[in-house]
Amino acid sequence: MSLPLQIWLIEHYSKPGDIILDPMCGSGTILAACSLSRNVIAVELEKKFVEMTEGNWKRVQEVGPELGHSMGWAIIRQGDARQLAGVLADVAIFSPPYSDVIRRGNPGGPGASGKGKQPSCLACYSEDPSNIGNLPYGDIDVVIASPLTEAKENIGNTKGDTYLRAMRIVYQQCYRCLKPHGLMILVVKPFIRNQQVIHLERDTQKLCESVGFTFLEEHYRRLTHMSFWRTLYARKHPKVERVDKEFILVFGG
């Protein structure tokens, strides 16, 4: 998510003094909210990104007061977005990993080639197989129809797990973390799998509604540039529909 878009979402969907949750904070751009008198709980799975977030927090603390707002506080913790016990927030704002990766040998991913091969990722989120962005996508109808299992032994068990099943648990955790009348704002983008566009925004709406959220609004932002890997893919498959929008989905708790 771009920083200008994130700031717009912060200003539009939260107010000074609110606690904003980002359960997949990456390098911590959500910390910009602290310079706008909001408070932040930032959760990130991987240590290297936690360290980036901590470094960015130091910079925000240095330059934030110059913007003329009172500074909010931030809590940064390493953890899994599927386990958010003890968190309470007014708003959740984040961009889930949306599988915009190019893989070889992954039957469930873009660029699949052959059976039984190990995936070779050209642009993965991480080398950690438990990272949700690295899981095979899954089937939305199967996930919605299945019971929502929260047993601790299933968290992080990547065998048979899918992106959709994992994200359903994340959204359920966010639903439980939000105060009454809280909001969850997601920025998602369709992606291409097997030369077909997968409309992640539609599947995401179904996942969120299945755990209790009410869908409120949808906006989109037209993308003017493709990623490097997506540009290469487009050249190789010129007939495949271009993904040129990202969607902002707003849900009520």
Predicted regions and their residues:
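Class I S-adenosyl-L-methionine-dependent methyltransferase catalytic core
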Residues: 1-253
